Structures are given as structure tokens and as C-alpha cells.
Design a protein with these regions (language model features):
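Proteolytic cleavage junctions
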Residues: 170-198
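Mature extracytoplasmic domains of secretory-pathway proteins
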Residues: 24-62, 92-165
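Long, charge-rich, low-complexity intrinsically disordered regions
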Residues: 53-96
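Sec-dependent signal peptide cleavage junction
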Residues: 1-14
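Generic structural motif
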Residues: 18, 140, 159-163, 173, ...
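N-terminal, helix-rich and Lys/Arg-enriched segments in bacterial and organellar proteins
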Residues: 1, 167-170
């Protein structure tokens, strides 16, 4: 039988939880303490909190910010008992977007590569946060490729058209300071994924 590590169990629990996509919403800035800043999104009768760290902290000053898209995922930890998300903030679309990026999945075990496959990755925003891309791809890999079960680790590479790439190591959660990074979707050339057998 496959022995699933504690790390894989933790990652699976995080990436398998529900996410919420807010489109064209307004965020309100609140300072909890001088060094701690949150954006609040009002959703019906509840308020969802987004911790602003890194670039987001500088970018979103006091007051009200309109026309935002937000990809919201609860973090494992809480702040003063309240759940919160980190990053995932982009500007709302100026125009409708309906793109497909091709994702290639290579399966590997101790002898090397043994299988590959393709799937379409749907894009409906002009800009996407790395948080959203990382979360959606890992969720798909959990549901369809046994990630954090039979396949324990690997790497996602999002290649850009002209130069550069973004890499996500599948044996660790996306770093908090990358959750607010944003990519223009027209820059995405292709997505390459390697999943490695436990």
C-alpha cells in the first residue's frame, strides 16, 4: 500500500478545500495593528478577510478599492479567531475573456517517464494571480491524477511566450509572498506539469 506522508495529507487538505471567486467586487481596507492590514469583502451577511502582505500591502492603501476580482481560499491559520485568505487580488476584466491554455502532464516513477497526457486549462480573466493558477491546477491534479496520493510530488511550470516562466514545487504550498503575484493571461504560452510517483 502507498504510505502517504503528513506533508502530502496537509497539502491535499489545503488544495482540496472550496475556493470562492468574487468578480467585480469592492474591497475595504482595515488596519488591525500598524503592521497588519486586511482587505474586507462584504458577501451578503458575512465579511471575508484578505491579509495584505508584500506588494499588496504597498499597493492597496487606505480606503475603498473597486472593480476587483478576488480568488479566495481560507488559510490554515486564523487571525484572532477569524478565517482569512492571502493575495489572489486582480483588477476586474475590461472585456470578456475565453481562452484555453494547454497543460501537458508527464508521469514519472523511479525508472523515469512512463506516461503523458494533456488537458485544457480554462481562463476567463485578463489577469490571474499565481495563487489562482496554482490552486486550480493542483486541484485538477488531485481530482484526476492522484496528486498527494499515488503521485506524491512534482513540479508545475507555466511558460511565458517571450521569456521567463513561473514554477510551483508540488511538495510545498505556494509561498505567501507569491500569492499576490499577477500574470497577464495573454503572456501564457503553455503549462508543463511533472507528477512523480510516491
Amino acid at each position: 500500500p502507498i504510505v502517504i506522508s503528513e506533508n502530502s495529507k496537509k497539502l491535499k487538505a489545503y488544495y482540496n478545500q472550496p475556493s470562492i471567486e468574487y468578480k467585480n467586487v469592492t474591497g475595504y481596507i482595515s488596519f488591525i495593528q500598524p503592521s497588519i492590514k486586511f482587505m474586507n469583502i462584504i458577501d451578503g451577511n458575512s465579511v471575508n478577510n484578505i491579509a495584505l502582505i508584500g506588494k499588496d500591502k504597498q499597493h492597496y492603501h487606505t480606503g475603498v478599492h473597486r472593480n476587483l476580482n478576488i480568488f479566495y481560499v481560507n488559510e490554515d491559520k486564523r487571525f484572532e479567531g477569524a478565517k482569512y485568505s492571502i493575495g489572489g487580488i486582480t483588477s476586474a476584466n475590461d472585456k470578456a475573456v475565453d481562452l484555453i491554455a494547454e497543460a501537458r502532464v508527464i508521469k514519472e516513477d523511479h525508472t523515469g517517464e512512463y506516461d503523458y497526457d494533456f488537458f485544457p486549462f480554462k481562463i476567463d480573466k485578463e489577469a490571474m494571480s499565481l495563487k489562482e493558477i496554482d490552486f486550480k491546477l493542483r486541484k485538477y491534479l488531485i481530482d484526476n491524477y492522484g496528486l498527494y496520493g499515488e503521485m506524491s510530488t512534482g513540479k508545475i511550470t507555466v511558460k511565458k511566450k517571450y521569456y521567463g516562466k513561473y514554477t510551483f514545487e508540488l511538495d510545498k504550498k505556494l509561498q505567501e509572498d507569491r500569492m499576490f503575484d499577477v500574470i497577464n493571461v495573454t503572456d501564457i504560452d503553455r503549462i508543463e506539469i511533472k507528477v512523480i510517483k510516491a
